[in-house]
Every structure is written in C-alpha cells, then in structure tokens.
Amino acid sequence: MYLSKIICKKVPMKLLCTRNAATVSAAATNALQKEQPSGEAMIARPRLVDLDKRWGIMSQEEKDGLITDLYARQKQPWTTLSIEEKKAAYWIAFGEHGPRAFSHISQKTVFWGTVAGLTIGVVLFGLIRTQAAPSPRTMTREWQEKSNEYMKENKINPISGEASEGFKGRGQISGGIFSPSEKDKK
C-alpha cells in the first residue's frame, strides 16, 4: 500500500515536473535570447519567413528581439548567414515599413499640386521679369546688324566667319526663340 501511494504520487509529480521544466526551460531560453543574443546560432526559420507580411502585426518586443538577433548575426562572416537571414536583414533595413511605407495619394491631389506649382512658377517668373533691368543696347536687332556689317568691312574672321565668301549664317544676330529666322526674311 505504501508503494502504491509513492508510485501514484511520483508519477504525476514527474509528469508535472517535466511540464514545468519544459515551460521554465522555454522561458529561460527566451529570456537569454533577449538579453544576450548569440551571434553564432542561426535564427529560427519561422521567425524569418514572410517577415514583410508579418511585420505590421508583430509586437514591438518581437521586432526589437529580431533586430537585435540579426544585428548580432551580422557581426559574423556573411557566408555563415542563411538566405532567410540575409533577406530579413535587407528587409528590415530597406523594406516598406516605418518612414518608407507606401502612402496612398489620390490623383486629384497630385494634379492640383502640380497645377499650383506651375501657376506659382509662372507668376514668379512674370514678377521677376517685370523687375529686371532693360536689355542692353547691344541686344537690339539694329546693333547686331551693324556689328555684322562692321565685321564684313574689316574682314574679321575671313575663313569661316561673317567676312568669308558665301556666308549664310546669322552672324552676330542673336537667335532666340522670338527672333525671326532666315526663312522669315525671304
């Protein structure tokens, strides 16, 4: 009878102790990993798979733990990192989360922002143009035509310039977009 009481008490106690030991062991392992991540041990694959999809629902403690573990692993040679660890490290560094998260902007906002920017630019250009100094006298068409005649009379640049035989270019006449071209003269 005494033996049956011992067996009955010890068997459930062993089972209970085993369960407690497993729970305590798991909790201690998690605590150790959070306190001192070992850079030599690989990070468990389930923690890394589909990280981009799970990142938004992970708790801040999980994120911090994973970042710390990856940081410790990256101190080792990169040849020892698994492909999942490399992908996770890249995604944490450059993924679409936090300040790099994709923001949805409506097309109307973009359109009206562009219209407002162009309008402000045109108004500023007009205001600056009205306050600008007048163009110098050397920019008038008469002055530039006289400069061409002067260059022909004094044979300035006789090989390829205005004084050369058969010259058909504009010479000193400025060729802005509002200046008449050679076709308009004929």
From Swiss-Prot:
GO molecular function: oxidoreductase activity
Major localization class: mitochondrion
Biological pathway: Energy metabolism; oxidative phosphorylation
Mitochondrial matrix-side segments: 21-107
Family annotation (InterPro entries): Cyt_c_oxidase_su4_fam, Cyt_c_oxidase_su4_sf
UniProt KW Transmembrane helix keyword: yes
GO biological process: mitochondrial electron transport, cytochrome c to oxygen; proton transmembrane transport
Keyword Metal-binding recorded: no
Subcellular location: Mitochondrion inner membrane
Sequence ranges on the Mitochondrial intermembrane membrane side: 129-186
Membrane-spanning segments: 108-128
Region annotation (Disordered) ranges: 149-186
Family matches, as Pfam families: COX4 (PF02936)
Residue range covered by the transit peptide: 1-20
Lipid bilayer topology: Single-pass membrane protein
GO cellular component: mitochondrial inner membrane; mitochondrion; respiratory chain complex IV
Protein family (similarity comment): Belongs to the cytochrome c oxidase IV family.
Assembly and binders: Component of the cytochrome c oxidase (complex IV, CIV), a multisubunit enzyme composed of a catalytic core of 3 subunits and seevral supernumerary subunits. The complex exists as a monomer or a dimer and forms supercomplexes (SCs) in the inner mitochondrial membrane with ubiquinol-cytochrome c oxidoreductase (cytochrome b-c1 complex, complex III, CIII).
Name this polypeptide is given: Cytochrome c oxidase polypeptide 5, mitochondrial
Native organism: Schizosaccharomyces pombe (strain 972 / ATCC 24843) (Fission yeast)
Encoding gene, per UniProt annotation: cox5
